[in-house]
Amino acid sequence: AGEECDCGSPANPCCDAATCKLRPGAQCADGLCCDQCRFIKKGKICRRARGDNPDDRCTGQSADCPRNRFH
């Protein structure tokens, strides 16, 4: 418990593999809405929708790509 990121790889520049905590200044370590240890800005498409549904977009507050309510 208490892990902030996946400490499997010491090569991840966002995550301290020894402590499983984000490195100083990092907001995230991975995820569809994480780029270079930072949350991707709100509104960026993170998952293209199928059919007539709207695309899923980053919130700017999380590394996760939220599913829109039509999925």
Swiss-Prot record:
Expressed by the venom gland. It is found in: Secreted. One of its GO terms (cellular component) is plasma membrane. A motif (Cell attachment site) lies at residues 50-52. GO terms for molecular function: toxin activity. Disulfide bonds join C5-C20, C7-C15, C14-C37, C28-C34, C33-C58, C46-C65. Residues 50-71 are annotated as: Disordered. Residues 1-71 form the Disintegrin domain. The keyword Secreted applies. InterPro entries: Disintegrin_CS (IPR018358), Disintegrin_dom (IPR001762), Disintegrin_dom_sf (IPR036436). Keywords: Cell adhesion impairing toxin, Disulfide bond, Hemostasis impairing toxin, Platelet aggregation inhibiting toxin, Secreted, Toxin. Inhibits fibrinogen interaction with platelets. Acts by binding to alpha-IIb/beta-3 (ITGA2B/ITGB3) on the platelet surface and inhibits aggregation induced by ADP, thrombin, platelet-activating factor and collagen. Monomer (disintegrin). Belongs to the venom metalloproteinase (M12B) family. P-II subfamily. P-IIa sub-subfamily. The disintegrin belongs to the medium disintegrin subfamily. This is Disintegrin viridin. It comes from Crotalus viridis viridis.
